[in-house]
Regions:
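Short, well-ordered beta-to-alpha junction loops that form the rim of enzyme active sites
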Residues: 92-93, 169
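Helix-start/capping segments and mature chain N-termini
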Residues: 1-76, 98-275
Length: 275
């Protein structure tokens, strides 16, 4: 493996040289939050929005994070990497316990960790599986507590799929690592934000840009049948960009490859953020 630039508690090292305590609350309780900051053609995509979301996640867990220091470390990682295209993964945990305990001591220090890797933003068509959303009730926090996502995503892979689209009580929430959009002939739809949906940065950017372009978009509550009636479905994330769904496993659909509204949204996103 190549030497991957990383930082742990303010010290820059290669990823393989970093040692983390097994009593880190990130390790024992997933008591941590994270952010993924993409950059393309040496330009960071929506840096301030990503930092704001990380701060919001920290605030939700009562982490007193030094946002200025975190921002500086993320920028330093990107500069050290010499990659034109990639992303930074950055994580903040409550810290290291003297011994494992559900109740934490307020005196422990926050633990920070990040690394940078190369990534090419190449659009890929996906086969997805629809599944029940079995995650916890605060998916709006970008927490590392992702076991529900992990189990669903690996079940999808074992069944020949690339991703999942989840529903709770038959209402569409989000993908395993993405937000969901779909379209019919003249309108784009996406589930409204709630405690069951992460406020995706790519989701936010896309909504802003397509509104400015005059494309009709509706946020609301949509069920599985609404999704399956769609002419186009796509997923969005910081690493996927816009990824078109070509098949919903085991379901009859009306999907049109490269539907005009998907192509219009894709062109807008690529022009504004990936070129």
């Amino acid at each position: 493996m190549e030497n991957i630039h990383a930082v742990y508690n303010g010290r820059f090292k290669f990823l393989n040289d970093i040692k983390i305590s097994p009593l880190s609350r990130a390790y024992t309780f997933s008591d941590s939050v994270y952010e993924v900051i993409p950059f393309c053609n040496s330009n960071i995509i929506a840096f301030d929005k990503h930092i704001t979301r990380l701060k919001n996640s920290c605030d939700s867990l009562s982490f007193k994070a030094d946002v200025k220091k975190i921002s500086s470390e993320i920028l330093d990682l990107i500069n050290k990497s010499n990659h034109a295209n990639g992303y930074v993964y950055y994580q903040v945990s409550r810290g290291i316990d003297p011994i494992r305990s559900h109740m934490f001591d307020d005196s422990i220090s926050l633990e920070t960790f990040g690394y940078v890797v190369e990534h090419n933003f190449i659009s890929k068509s996906l086969t997805v599986m629809i599944c029940e959303d079995m995650r916890w009730q605060r998916c709006d926090i970008k927490s590392t507590s992702l076991l529900g996502n992990v189990l669903s995503m690996n079940n999808a892979r074992n069944n020949g799929c690339d991703e999942v689209i989840m529903h709770k009580n038959n209402l569409i929430t989000e993908g395993g690592a993405s937000n969901v959009f779909f379209a019919n002939d003249d309108c784009v739809f996406t589930p409204s934000l709630s405690n069951n949906i992460l406020p995706g940065i790519t989701r936010e950017l896309l909504i802003e840009e397509i509104k400015q372009a005059g494309i009709k978009i509706e946020e609301g509550q949509f069920d599985v049948d609404d999704l399956l009636r769609a002419k186009s479905i796509w997923l969005t994330s910081s690493t996927k960009g816009l990824a078109q769904v070509k098949e919903v496993s085991g379901k009859k659909t009306n999907l049109v490859n490269d539907h005009q509204l998907f192509k219009a949204c894709e062109e807008i996103f690529v022009k504004n953020f990936l070129s």
